[in-house]
Amino acid sequence: MRFKWTVIALASAVALAGAAAAFVQPGTTRWLEMQTGESASGGQARALWNAALDLARPPLRLAGDAAISPRVDSPYAVNTFLHQEVEPAKRARQLQMIREAGFTWIRQPFPWYDLEVGAKGDFTDRRNAPAKSAWDKYDNIVTLAEEYGVGIIARLEAPPEWAHQGFADLGTLGPPAEFADYADYAAAVAQRYKGRIRAYQLWNEPNIYPEWGAQAVNPEDYAKMLCLAHARVKAIDPDAIVLAAALAPTVDQSGRDLSDLIFLQRMYTAGAGKCFDVAAAQGYGLFSGPEDRRLSPLGTNVARHTLMRDIMVANGDAGKPIWLAEANWNALPPVNAGIAGYGNFGIVTLEEQARYVPQLYTRARRDWPWVGAIAVWFFKPASDADKNQAVYYFRMLEPDFTPLPLYEALKAMPK
């Protein structure tokens, strides 16, 4: 078997080397970009070499003809932070523009710390006078989403201080001391919005710091928490779609961070396969474009979820979809003026960003039948307070609602 794959590798390398020599001719740069996701000739050459190595690997188990359920009528989704808008009119304006652009889903946080604020079972917000129901803002968000015909993927995460119970040194985003408390919070949200919120995502990126706190990540513990919350949500609303946490694409195995592929397999080994309807991945392009076909456990790109799909099929989950919970390219200013994290997520121009994201939707329809909703990260910040952070430059709108090229491109895209 080893001899067989060696022969294939050598033959592939020879063939692609010849192809590369032929392709580096006038008029072929765009074709190569479409095949490799790289715009520069050096990157294209490396991509061709990596493609040869990919051909030498055993084929992935993708079950492309499997019947997928649940399916979505439209994959167009976007991440929102409507709870950060103080004025209800601004929430309404966001949802109006979201619907006008053809989006049919929002992925919206329902932060635990902002709902069950002071103590277990206490949904009164006393942080400012006068005290009021902590549900008020979220009731408004759900009602507005219904008015504009937009489905909600509710992110359930971010514990209040009381839920850490002596574990606060792990960080504000870390898991609660008692997983049953998280399940109770998920149940409270599901009970209040039964039949109105269509999907719930149980946590986010538990395979990396800081989302699992300042401690070693633990797929087995996350599986326990997931299964507890899944059971509670389904008991209240059997028709709700439950998403597992989106796993961050990483090759790290340091302990505080763990490869998404290893984390997912350990989730399955711990019995989590029965505790979600949809797997979730992050669809960031990072350092290459939307057509990058390279696949390696030791590299990250827009197609990395394909490796997760292989693990799902191997564990008997060919019928479940993957939703891309966050997807985009980082359109940073050309000169770094003190922006923290500059270049950590790659760098593209606003024009490239506006071209790449529509191409991602097109590729998903063409190549990835198991991919459902794709949620662009993100729609709009409430203010420009984070302009010194690289993550700010994933936005589609400025804080004053000025649309950027990505918004206009997606609005114009046939759907």
Residue ranges and their predicted role:
Residues F179, A183, V217-I347, R395-M396, ...:
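Noncatalytic carbohydrate-binding groove/subsite architecture in carbohydrate-active enzymes
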Residues M1-V14:
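N-terminal Sec-pathway targeting helices
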Residues S74-T80, I106-Q108, I152-L156, Y200-L202, ...:
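Hydrophobic faces of well-ordered beta-strands that scaffold small-molecule active sites
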Residues A21-W105, K120-D122, N128, T143-L144, ...:
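N-terminal carbohydrate-binding accessory modules
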Residues A101-T124, N128-R256, L286, L332-P334, ...:
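Substrate-binding cleft and catalytic face of glycoside hydrolase catalytic domains
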Residues E85-R99, F179-Q191, D257-T269, A354-R363:
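Short, acidic/polar
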Residues I98, I106, A145, V189, ...:
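Conserved, mostly hydrophobic/aromatic
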Residues W5, A17, P26-S69, D122, ...:
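Aromatic-rich peripheral "rim/lid" segments of glycoside hydrolase catalytic domains that contact
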